[in-house]
UniProtKB/Swiss-Prot annotation:
Record flagged with keyword Kinase: no
Family the entry assigns: Belongs to the bacterial ribosomal protein bL36 family.
Lineage top rank: taxon: Bacteria
Phylogenetic lineage: Bacteria, Pseudomonadati, Pseudomonadota, Betaproteobacteria, Burkholderiales
Record keyword Isomerase present: no
InterPro entries: Ribosomal_bL36, Ribosomal_bL36_sp
Name of the protein this chain belongs to: Large ribosomal subunit protein bL36
GO biological process terms on file: translation
Length: 37
């Protein structure tokens, strides 16, 4: 899980979603998991 100020899609499987006001990236590749913080 990467915590970054700006979350970006890395590959075409990445999806940007909002959970409880937190922007997250979910992907089939676990290395692409990110959240904004």
């Amino acid at each position: 899980m990467k915590v970054s100020a700006s979350v970006k899609k890395i590959c075409r499987n990445c999806k940007i979603i909002r959970r409880k006001g937190v922007v997250r990236v979910i992907c089939t590749d676990p290395r692409h998991k990110q959240r904004q913080g």
